[in-house]
A protein has these predicted regions:
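Short, conserved loop/helix-junction motifs that constitute active-site signature segments
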Residues: 126-130
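Cap/insert and terminal regions of metallo-dependent hydrolase folds
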Residues: 81-95, 199-270
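Feature marks short, surface-exposed loop/turn motifs that line or immediately flank catalytic pockets
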Residues: 16, 67-69, 142, 211-213, ...
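Metallo-beta-lactamase
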Residues: 1-118, 133-182, 201-207, 227-247, ...
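Active-site metal-binding loops of divalent metal-dependent hydrolases
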Residues: 12-13, 63-66, 115, 139-140, ...
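Core dinuclear metal-dependent hydrolase active-site scaffold
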Residues: 6-9, 49-53, 59, 170-198
């Protein structure tokens, strides 16, 4: 743990989507024989990034959705299933940086949980950065560059191909009290972020290792977008074990209900 850390949660716009993508819970998303015409559960899917002002460096966790989402996602069809239809000018990550008084190159570390379209969407802000270290997991890097063409599933190469990416393997402490956790399953190399704060205690930002409180359980409930279900369930239990050991606050990847209750920029956790 390190004294003097400030952690800011930054909403970066809300998509809407069929909840089935995020939660395979029959009573919430599926028809049954008594209700065969049940409509889709069209749900809010908020996104967020995190800024950590640490005595030893400035950190951004994830890069949100891109401003040009409709055009960028056009070749993939993702814009039809995940429209970014609830966002204001101040929410885009480049706007958030200005609110913090920073340019992209002022940031010491950009930590990318994984390289999906809604987590690396504005990572291009760092394509010309000479100071910032941009980190993802080795498994995510290998997978994200393993295919030919514009996209594969929710990976869109335009988001990350211009970046100078450095990779990590295993759980890695980036700065004192700030640790990347390997939590694969959602993608090849999804990571979560553990931050040990002097006053607020430990916080674990799960990204898409755990979408929602309902995903976490127990028991854990899977989702429509999962690359490896066995690894995904193992990652949920890894997070649960760490959370129980450290009495951590677990912050889910896309929970609107939880996000509404969290402190948000300009307020912070310390």
């Amino acid at each position: 743990m390190s004294d003097g850390i400030k952690l800011y949660v930054m909403p970066t716009g809300t998509m809407h989507a069929d909840l089935t993508w995020l939660l395979l819970r029959p009573d919430m998303v599926m028809a049954d024989r008594h209700n065969t015409a049940r409509p889709a559960n069209w749900a809010a899917v908020p996104t967020h990034c995190v800024y950590i002002d640490h005595p030893d460096g400035k950190i951004i966790w994830d890069a949100g959705v891109p401003r040009d989402w409709e055009e960028r996602w056009g070749p993939t069809g993702l814009q039809e299933y995940f429209p970014v239809d609830e966002v204001t000018e101040d929410m885009w990550l480049d706007s958030r940086l200005k609110q913090l008084g920073h340019e992209p190159n002022d940031i010491d570390y950009l930590l990318l949980s994984h390289l999906h379209f809604d987590h690396a969407g504005q990572a291009e802000l760092w394509k010309d950065a000479t100071h910032t270290k941009v980190l993802c997991s080795k498994d995510e890097y290998d997978g994200a560059f393993s295919y030919e063409g514009y996209s594969l599933g929710a990976h869109v190469k335009k988001d990350y191909e211009s970046l100078t990416l450095e990779t990590v393997e295993g759980d890695t402490e980036v700065l004192p009290g700030v640790t990347l956790l390997q939590t694969p399953g959602h993608t090849w190399g999804t990571m979560s972020l553990k931050v040990d704060l002097p006053d607020s205690g430990t916080m674990i930002f799960t990204s898409d290792a755990i979408y929602l409180a309902e995903s976490y359980g127990p028991p854990a409930i899977g989702a429509g977008i999962v690359y490896d279900s066995v690894k995904w369930f193992a990652s949920v239990e890894k997070i649960r074990g760490i959370a129980e050991e450290t009495n951590a606050t677990v912050v889910f990847g896309h929970s609107g209900a939880q996000l509404a209750e969290l402190k948000k920029i300009p307020d912070y956790y310390s």
